[in-house]
């Protein structure tokens, strides 16, 4: 493909608006299904390149520079339909390439008719919003696309200034976007051409439904809308009926609880009191690999990170009680491999752009099968192999049986010699004592704020402020 010079496109804005130019990815057979209502059913096709899908040369070059050698299934099936001007429902797991599936058609349309406030992407969490924006900017680098990220936890005035610069793409969490729609003078989305709701099931799980309704009421009806979700719940069905026009459904998974064939999953049946020892044994069995360890609480995440560092492991915590800059810093260190172990609550289970994870360890089992699928989906991505281990104690048997039932199979137990494991007990015990001491100091130093590390969770009856809804608690 011939090399491209960096382009700048401009447009003539509507009367009263400032002139605005471009200034500064499952292994099963993909299927297209008919959605309930008036939407159509069409046959899946096979393509070999982004150009075959109808993507223009400059965007194909951007894909090539990012290492996108061939379209993933969700991209191959959804992009041609999007280019035809259809509304879409995309059912795809994390790691299927769905961000590029909606970003490429939007960028191509933007190049054809450039304008400010062209596209809006709604995401459930702050981290995912930043990642989507980064991917838009990377794919649109040759045309200098300009994005604004509008999420909670950041300064409203700075965001209002960014919106005043007339970005082409806005990536936002719903609560903070509605704040700006209600309070930022001169900001509106009346000229919007594209709306994307990413991780729609997660948006609704976080109770963004009423906020989404308010946002939808102020958007122009003449627009293209894409809804992407890992599952098609009744809530998601209601949302698509309210927001999409005659959509096509694109699905790349026939099984709600399907995992990829390149993922090897095992469990370890162990006594609860020895969980830390078995965890260290497993990490020693797979030295140097990139690992995500999932825990259930903020407190356990912090404790395990301290324990692992005391034993010489490059571990870093990620949870919802860290500041926004600390969370982004933790992700950056893990992506760059300056730390190879990420100890995380389920804030990292969905959507985060962590490309090469070799191993997922469920230190604590999730409470439901869907979360298990999202956790282990962090490995064995894009055709690569991966492993997932789950520590199952005497208190977890019922939950584990439910997970296996949802998967439709019993997972093999990973056999270890107990004597070999218990050799580590003295060293682990010393590290545990160190972690207890450091955690105590951490709580004392934070004073009242230390409560944020004491397993704080939002109960079903409790309400979070709109600004906090895009911040993961656990």
Swiss-Prot record:
One of its GO terms (molecular function) is ATP hydrolysis activity. The keyword Chaperone does not apply. Residues 24-36 have a biased composition (Polar residues). Residues 464-474 have a biased composition (Basic and acidic residues). Residues 1-10, 448-463 have a biased composition (Basic residues). Coiled coil: none annotated. It comes from the Eukaryota. It catalyses: ATP + H2O = ADP + phosphate + H(+). It is found in: Nucleus. InterPro entries: DDX47/Rrp3_DEADc, DEAD/DEAH_box_helicase_dom, DEAD_box_RNA_helicase, Helicase_ATP-bd, Helicase_C-like, P-loop_NTPase, RNA-helicase_DEAD-box_CS, RNA_helicase_DEAD_Q_motif. Residues 278-422 form the Helicase C-terminal domain. Residues 79-250 form the Helicase ATP-binding domain. The Q motif is unique to and characteristic of the DEAD box family of RNA helicases and controls ATP binding and hydrolysis. This is ATP-dependent rRNA helicase RRP3. It comes from Coccidioides immitis (strain RS). The lineage of its organism: Eukaryota, Fungi, Dikarya, Ascomycota, Pezizomycotina. The gene is RRP3.
């Amino acid at each position: 493909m011939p090399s491209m010079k960096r382009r700048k496109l401009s447009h003539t804005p509507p009367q009263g608006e400032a002139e605005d130019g471009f200034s500064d990815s499952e292994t099963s057979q993909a299927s297209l299904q008919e959605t309930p209502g008036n939407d159509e059913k069409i046959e899946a096709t096979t393509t070999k390149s982004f150009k075959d899908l109808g993507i223009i040369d400059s965007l194909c070059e951007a894909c090539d520079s990012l290492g996108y050698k061939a379209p993933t299934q969700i991209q191959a099936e959804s992009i041609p339909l999007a280019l035809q001007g259809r509304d879409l429902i995309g059912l795809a797991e994390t790691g299927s390439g769905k961000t590029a599936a909606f970003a490429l058609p939007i960028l191509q349309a933007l190049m054809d008719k450039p304008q400010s406030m062209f596209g809006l992407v709604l995401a459930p969490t702050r981290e995912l919003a930043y990642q989507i924006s980064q991917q838009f900017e990377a794919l649109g680098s040759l045309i200098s696309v300009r994005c604004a990220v509008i999420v909670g936890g950041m300064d409203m005035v700075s965001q209002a200034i960014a919106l005043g610069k007339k970005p082409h793409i806005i990536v936002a969490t719903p609560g903070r976007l509605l704040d700006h729609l209600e309070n930022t003078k001169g900001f509106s989305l009346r000229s919007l051409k594209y709306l994307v709701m990413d991780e729609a099931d997660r948006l609704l799980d976080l109770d963004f439904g009423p906020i989404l309704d308010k946002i939808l009421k102020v958007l122009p009806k003449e627009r293209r809308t894409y809804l992407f979700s890992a599952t098609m719940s009744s809530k998601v069905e209601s949302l698509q009926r309210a927001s999409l026009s005659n959509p096509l459904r694109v699905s790349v998974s026939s099984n709600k609880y399907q995992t990829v064939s390149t993922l090897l999953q095992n469990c370890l049946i162990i006594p609860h009191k020895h969980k830390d020892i078995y965890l260290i044994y497993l990490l020693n069995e797979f030295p140097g690999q990139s690992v995500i360890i999932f825990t259930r609480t903020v407190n356990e995440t912090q404790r395990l990170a301290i324990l692992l560092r005391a034993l010489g492991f490059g571990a870093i915590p990620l949870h919802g009680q860290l500041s926004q800059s600390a969370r982004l810093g933790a992700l950056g260190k893990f992506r760059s491999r300056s730390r190879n172990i990420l100890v995380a609550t389920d804030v990292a289970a969905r959507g985060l752009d962590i490309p090469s994870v070799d191993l997922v360890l469920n230190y604590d089992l999730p409470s439901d099968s869907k979360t298990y699928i999202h956790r282990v989906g962090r490995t064995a991505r894009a055709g690569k192999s991966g492993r997932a281990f789950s520590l199952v104690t005497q208190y977890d048997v019922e939950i584990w049986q439910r997970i296996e039932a949802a998967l439709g199979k019993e997972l093999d137990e990973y056999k270890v010699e107990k004597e070999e494991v218990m050799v580590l007990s003295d060293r682990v015990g010393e590290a545990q004592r160190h972690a207890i001491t450091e955690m105590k100091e951490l709580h004392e130093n934070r004073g009242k704020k230390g409560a944020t590390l004491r397993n704080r969770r939002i109960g079903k009856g409790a309400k979070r402020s709109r600004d906090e809804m895009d911040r993961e608690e656990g």
